[in-house]
């Protein structure tokens, strides 16, 4: 793909809908992307749903390439990523222009938190250069739901250079992000037009750095 974003700043926000749409157009490369093979990403690819229990998974994305988690519909929490038992999930660019997109993922059913990512039991998330667009949770956390059980003294949820756009929590709190009993680090992130039953973003027992 030839679309590159180095820094996701507010001045780029109006351009994002058309940029994301181009990824999913009929003639787009995204329509014929191969599935991701391994976690050292050298070419843009479509990722499958990730379910981690007590293990570590590190993704590295080469310059100008994309990892895309899209169109996943599940009847359990975590539309694209599910973490438990202190699992560790990292997606970072190798340099500056590797990108990740979580788009149009949704969950329903009895357990329906975290439209894109669900993390519990002190699992950790570290992501940078990422767009969360139009993910939907039936409960809490339209894009991300993160819950811990004790203070580890480190950031359990670290999100850098991200855009949260048009995410929805249909019957809960945190249109973009719901966090409880975890430490959070947010840097250079943009939140726009996320919707929830009571609030755009909600936290309880959280420390912001």
Regions found by a protein language model. Name each.
Residues 37-38, 42-53, 72-84, 104-120, ...:
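Extracellular beta-strand/beta-solenoid scaffold signature
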Residues 33-35, 62-72, 88-106, 124-136, ...:
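Right-handed parallel beta-helix
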Residues 26-30:
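Sec/Tat signal peptide C-region and signal peptidase I cleavage site
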Residues 48, 55-57, 65, 79, ...:
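The right-handed parallel beta-helix/beta-solenoid scaffold, focusing on the short coil/turn
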Residues 1-9:
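N-terminal secretory signal peptides that target proteins for export/translocation
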Residues 14-24:
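Bacterial N-terminal signal peptides
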Residues 9, 13-14, 47, 51:
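Terminal export signals
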